[in-house]
């Protein structure tokens, strides 16, 4: 799935957002009741689109400040959502995972739960579609919830603490794949132009400065791709142990392995998000530089890549937040320990 994400992003990073959000089905599969799984998973498999409705006007990086209200209706036998969500990618999707405040009188993360909203039930209005710098292939919406019916996913009060954390880790893998795809696209565009553009009687790829830039672009793209695949491997092994634990008790050695790969997944996911998104911006910048004045024009794809890349080190957790998340693993020696294993 991650490899496919990368290939889709190489073609169009905006469309990859719609494609990548289908991974919301994994969250439903892992945490939702059997009834909800039977209702939504076949629909998503048949082509229903997904969204994760987390951000609000006053709750961006600080999701603990989410205030969209979920109230239980005894009369209707369902939860009713009221409030506003902002900057929601693919906000008009068919199935939405919504972070909402179910506990009266709370103002922190412990009052938040995860709910699933079905577009067919109504109650949500797209008030605005953002006019964005890039990733124009997917709509980014402001949503108004007015008594929108929704169903609880998993347990109350665990929305941010457990379910969104899992969802965000998967989303950050997706942004890693998206960033690597854009790095590859930028490198290919730059390489193609350098082989075709001639100045001073020779193709510009033969100039040492251009050749060095291309070599660095290739090396960084391959390096961050390796980080993407390795991080995905850590996450996948941890998830497999989790699935096994639902079927039978794990052996002592298996529990130790599960704990180990959970630590690696937690440590390498922010590292991947940080480096891949920053490299995507750098690769897009360098691609335009190699194109010269032509790269500033909309006639060439690198102009679009440059605009698309800019959001990658912002959404699903800014680079600064990834540094904060990684610091704990630096001090605990997670990265150093793994480097020694590679050696």
Feature-to-residue mapping (PLM):
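Internal helix-loop-helix
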Residues: 1-46, 88-91, 315
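A glycine-rich, basic-preceded beta-loop-alpha segment at the flavin cofactor/substrate interface
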Residues: 120-123, 127, 139-171, 188-205, ...
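Glycine-rich phosphate/cofactor-binding loops in nucleotide/flavin-utilizing enzymes
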Residues: 3, 23, 293-343
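Extended amphipathic alpha-helical segments enriched in small hydrophobics
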Residues: 172-253, 336-343
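Charged, glycine-rich active-site and insertion segments that engage polyanionic ligands
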Residues: 261-294
